[in-house]
Regions:
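Conserved catalytic-core motifs of eukaryotic protein kinase domains, centered on the activation segment
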Residues: 64-66, 89-95, 154-157
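Active-site loop/oxyanion-hole signature of alpha/beta-hydrolase fold enzymes
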Residues: 29-31, 35-43, 79-124
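Short, hydrophobic alpha-helix immediately C-terminal to the catalytic nucleophile
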Residues: 66, 106, 130-134
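Conserved alpha/beta-hydrolase catalytic His-Asp/Glu region
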Residues: 40, 154, 163-207
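Conserved hydrolase catalytic core segment
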Residues: 77, 111-154
């Protein structure tokens, strides 16, 4: 689910959102830029020299941080993005390695002219955050990990396989409930949103 990028060829621009639905187009929270040919959706809230970057997990998107955005933005500039292959970002992906994603995140920050960040990563996003720290230590001012991947050899392959292969809301719900101690939190709206993402063009191949 990651992109192989040339760090010497980065173009920054806001792309008109002509292909999104009306709700997306009219939502000022969402911005779009281009990182070496890949369309990226992101949010940029708050102000100041202290910048927080939020990295979501596998199968998620920047809206996983919806209830954190405004609270963090009260005291920090707060960035979140749809990682390659996720959300409304591009689905053409060439490098599925952690190193490839760390490079992508670094290039994304270069596009926004952000030299350093406090990184918070969840699940896969945590593993990417740690890789970013290893490869670009000058970029990471602090590291916050939430249920991070990469801290041990265990990988829940049944969950990953089930998420990728689920074709219906019923199948997907059985998988997503594994993420919650209280299974009732896997709401119908959550399942429908995830299924809509999974059925989007290019997602199956990206995952």
């Amino acid at each position: 689910v990651f992109s192989n990028l040339d760090q010497n060829n980065i173009e920054a621009k806001v792309i008109p959102d002509s292909k999104e639905n009306n709700e997306e187009k009219n939502n000022p929270r969402y911005l779009f830029t281009d990182v070496d040919g890949l369309r990226v959706r992101y949010t940029d809230l708050g102000f100041g020299d202290s910048v927080v970057l939020l990295l979501h997990g596998f199968g998620g998107d920047l809206d996983n941080w919806f209830f954190n955005h405004d609270a963090l933005a009260e005291k920090h500039r707060t960035l979140a993005l749809d990682l390659p292959g996720h959300g409304q970002s591009g689905k053409t992906i060439h490098d599925p390695s952690l190193s490839g994603m760390a490079t992508f995140v670094s290039n994304f920050l270069d596009v926004l002219a952000v030299p350093s960040v406090h990184v918070v990563g969840h699940s896969m996003g945590g593993a990417i955050a740690m890789q970013l720290l290893l490869e670009c230590p000058e970029t990471v001012k602090s590291l916050g990990l939430i249920c991070s991947a990469g801290l041990g050899p265990e990988i829940n392959s049944d969950y990953l396989r089930g998420f990728v292969e689920a074709k219906t809301s019923h199948e997907l719900k059985q998988v997503v409930q594994q993420l919650f101690a209280d299974e009732s939190l896997a709401t119908l709206q959550l399942i429908e949103d995830l299924l809509k993402y999974k059925l989007s063009e290019g997602v199956e191949a990206a995952l």
